[in-house]
């Protein structure tokens, strides 16, 4: 009886218990493949924020913009150029075996957070045309990246005053007696002006060079680019201590100071450096401007009509700092070479080896544009002072008559 009473008081047992299952979550409408999360809390947080930014802000670059060109045909040799602060700036060199004092050595300055390997095909082309070539990565990028970018200090100023200067000195030292030329892409045209050794440059060529003042962006892209580069990018830099740009498909991961250099750009380049943590003293900011005036090499600035960064206003804003260089500003539209688009990056794609690259090669060899060069010259160098005086005198005589 007692046993029956106990059984009668016991709670009824379930005949069947459904196993628990995790809810299935589908990612619908994602324009990009899901990002694999890191096995850490910080990594998961970064991936979640980056994925959310890419999907909701629609701020990833077009896929064909940042694809690396085909692998290089010639194996370059790695080199290290120690900067003035001791940082090892790393890159690759194409060197001819037979020494020749008259052979030029061309230094290639990269765009912001674009690896130097992106320019390998163009470097191999210049090498095949008789030039020695050096390509390198700025500190924090590619071959010059430290183990961790979180807390790593680097700005555009460091890339110019330290890294570019170190490579120019390395070129002069290891290629003694050879003329030094520079090809500069995007911000590479800025860091050239900041390098104290820029007086050694014989000729300079820039492609889409500017310092990213947002009002100069192409009108149809301006608001989107403002949100991406001047709002989202500094926010990511503040959260993570650097910009995890590679996971977003933008570019290489970027040091915080570089992101601030970019996002704080003002009409005057030096005015981006008035607030911490990238603040420069008033004397140092005046020195920045003076450094650009040391470059006396003739410069060809190439701008592409469909480059949302390199508008006429943006390129001219930077060229205004090179007051002692004879500057030629050439504008090229895609239809003038029979293609649909070129944009900010594609100049260095090997598909333009027969159309755009000969323009660069001709300028580096002769310092002049060939008569058949496509495009429109927006600005030509001013007449030399003696010729200008003679012209003014002749016009004065004509007016007197």
Q: Can you say where each PLM-predicted feature lies in the sequence?
A:
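N-terminal cap/lid segment of alpha/beta-hydrolase-fold proteins
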Residues: 67-93
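Active-site glycine-rich loops that stabilize anionic/oxyanionic intermediates
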Residues: 111-114
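Conserved alpha/beta-hydrolase
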Residues: 116-118, 123-147
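Alpha/beta-hydrolase active-site loop
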Residues: 153-173
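Alpha/beta-hydrolase-fold enzymes
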Residues: 183, 187-275
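Short beta-strand/loop motif that positions the catalytic acidic residue
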Residues: 295, 301-303
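Short alpha-helix in the alpha/beta-hydrolase fold that links the catalytic acid
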Residues: 297, 311-321
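Catalytic active-site module of serine/aspartate enzymes centered on a nucleophile-bearing elbow/loop
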Residues: 333-392, 396-397, 401
């Amino acid at each position: 009886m007692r046993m029956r009473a106990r059984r009668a008081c016991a709670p009824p047992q379930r005949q069947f218990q459904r196993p628990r299952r995790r809810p299935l979550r589908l990612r619908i409408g994602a324009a990009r493949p899901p990002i694999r999360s890191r096995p850490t809390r910080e990594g998961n947080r970064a991936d979640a924020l980056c994925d959310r930014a890419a999907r909701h802000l629609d701020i990833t670059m077009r896929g064909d913009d940042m694809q690396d060109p085909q692998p290089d045909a010639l194996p370059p040799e790695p080199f290290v150029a120690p900067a003035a602060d001791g940082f090892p700036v790393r890159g690759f060199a194409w060197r001819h075996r037979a020494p020749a004092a008259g052979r030029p050595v061309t230094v290639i300055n990269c765009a912001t957070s674009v690896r130097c390997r992106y320019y390998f095909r163009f470097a191999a082309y210049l090498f095949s045309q008789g030039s020695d070539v050096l390509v390198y990565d700025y500190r924090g990028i590619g071959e010059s990246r430290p183990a961790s970018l979180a807390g790593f200090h680097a700005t555009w100023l460091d890339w110019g005053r330290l890294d570019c200067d170190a490579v120019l000195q390395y070129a002069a030292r290891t290629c003694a007696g050879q003329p030094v030329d520079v090809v500069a892409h995007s911000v590479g045209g800025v860091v050239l002006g900041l390098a104290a050794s820029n007086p050694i440059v014989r000729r300079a060529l820039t492609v889409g060079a500017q310092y990213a003042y947002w009002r100069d962006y192409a009108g149809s892209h301006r608001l989107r680019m403002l949100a991406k580069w001047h709002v989202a990018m500094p926010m990511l830099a503040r959260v993570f201590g650097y910009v995890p740009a590679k996971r977003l498909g933008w570019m290489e991961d970027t040091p915080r100071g570089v992101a601030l250099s970019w996002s704080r750009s003002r009409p005057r380049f030096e005015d981006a450096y008035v607030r911490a943590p990238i603040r420069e003293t008033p004397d140092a900011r005046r020195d920045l401007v003076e450094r650009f005036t040391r470059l006396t090499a003739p410069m060809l600035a190439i701008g592409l009509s469909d480059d949302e960064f390199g508008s006429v206003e943006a390129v001219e804003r930077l060229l205004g700092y090179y007051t002692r260089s004879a500057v030629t500003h050439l504008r090229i539209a895609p239809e003038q070479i029979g293609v649909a688009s070129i944009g900010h990056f594609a100049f260095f794609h090997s598909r333009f080896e027969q159309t755009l690259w000969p323009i660069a090669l001709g300028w580096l060899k002769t310092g002049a544009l060939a008569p058949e060069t496509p495009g429109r010259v927006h600005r030509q160098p001013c007449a030399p002072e003696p010729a200008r005086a003679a012209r003014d005198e002749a016009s004065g005589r004509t007016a007197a008559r």
